[in-house]
Amino acid sequence: SDISGDMIVMTRNNLNKAGILFDIPLKQIEAQAIKPPSEIPGIILTNPPYGERIGVRGDSTIETDDMASAFFSALSATLKQRFAGWRVFLFSADLSLPKLLRLKEARKTPFFNGALECRLFRFDMVAGFNRREQAKPKEA
């Protein structure tokens, strides 16, 4: 899925060029609106928007990146709320992606997209709260 209809057409063309003849459902939708296609946990693989695809990210003339922060906060909330038990793989040139999502990656694999350094981050989504409680001081 992608918010851009052009990306859907491009993806379908690339699947055909790759010889993938079976139908893969593609739809135009905002990332925050996705829902699991089944009750059985699976895998999500995505290349989330960054740079010019998300608006202002990486523009040194802009101090804060509210658009990107809002997008990744909403995406993270969607993944946490709807995809417990799923493995989520995000491919990005933004090496600070786990921090933006406020998620701890289970694994990160380095790749290059041409000269652009990227990572494939794996997140194992869990139900509920995954932070450990801080140690409480012993009473005297």
Name each model feature, range by range.
Residues S1-A140:
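Class I S-adenosyl-L-methionine-dependent methyltransferase catalytic core
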